[in-house]
Amino acid sequence: MNKLNEALKKAERIVFLTGAGVSVPSGIPDYRSKNGLYAGMSSPEYMLSHTCLVREPEKFYQFVTENMYYPNAVPNVIHKKMAEIETEKDVTIITQNIDGLHEKAGSKKVVNFHGSLYHCYCQNCGMTVTAKDYLKSDIHTDCGGVIRPDVVLYEEAISESAIDQSLTAIRKADLIVIVGTSFRVSPFCNLTDYRNKKARIFAVNKERISLPYPFEMMESDAVKVFEEI
C-alpha cells in the first residue's frame, strides 16, 4: 500500500484540488502543454477574455463552442475514485476544471473554482439557460440578450462564494491531495496557505510542483496512482 492510500484510509476530512491533468485522460485537452488547447493558436487568452466577450461576442461564442465543449467526454478512474471515496469520507473537491466531469462521476461536494461550462445565463435578464440551448445559439430567445457560460474569463475575478466554500473546506481538512495541476495559477495555488497546519499534503502530478512548506510529491501518472486506490 502506498503512502497516499494509507493517508486516505486514516483521514476523516479530505480536500482534492484538481486541475486539467485530471480530465486529459477523458479526452479533454489541457491548456499549455505541447498538445494543449493553446498549442499553435494566436492570442487564445484574448479569445477567453471578458474584453472579447464584450467587444466581439460572435468571435467569443465561436471559440468557446468549437474548442471548450466536450459533451461526449466521460469521467475516468480519477473522477470515479474520488466520488467513491466521498461515499465513506467527508470529501470536498475544489477544481479548476470547467467540464462538469466530477459531477458526472457522482461527486456531490464540488467547488467549481473557475465556474462551469454547463451553467449558462443571459447577461441581459439573468435567466439560467441550458448548455444545450447555448450550444445552439448565444442569443436568448426570451429577451434577445447575449448568453454566456458561467466561467471565470481572463480579467474576471473568482466568485466570493467559490473562495468562501474553498477556504471553509481547506481549514477543516486533515488531508489535502493536489492532482493534475502545476499549481501555479493564483489564487488557486494559494488555497493551501489556509490549511490546518496539522493537515498532510500530497501532490500527484507528472511534473514536480513546488510549495513553500512540507508535502509529499508523487511524480507519476494520476491514472496509475488512482487505479491502485
Swiss-Prot record:
InterPro entries: DHS-like_NAD/FAD-binding_dom (IPR029035), NAD-dep_sirtuin_deacylases (IPR050134), Sirtuin (IPR003000), Sirtuin_cat_small_dom_sf (IPR026591), Sirtuin_class_U (IPR028628), Ssirtuin_cat_dom (IPR026590). GO terms for molecular function: histone deacetylase activity, NAD-dependent; NAD+ binding. It is an enzyme of class 2 (transferase). The gene is cobB. One of its GO terms (cellular component) is cytoplasm. Keywords: Cytoplasm, NAD, Transferase. It holds the Pfam family SIR2. This is NAD-dependent protein deacetylase. Nicotinamide binds at residues 98-99. NAD(+) binds at residues 20, 32, 96, 98-99, 114, 181-182, 205, 223. The active site is at residue 114.
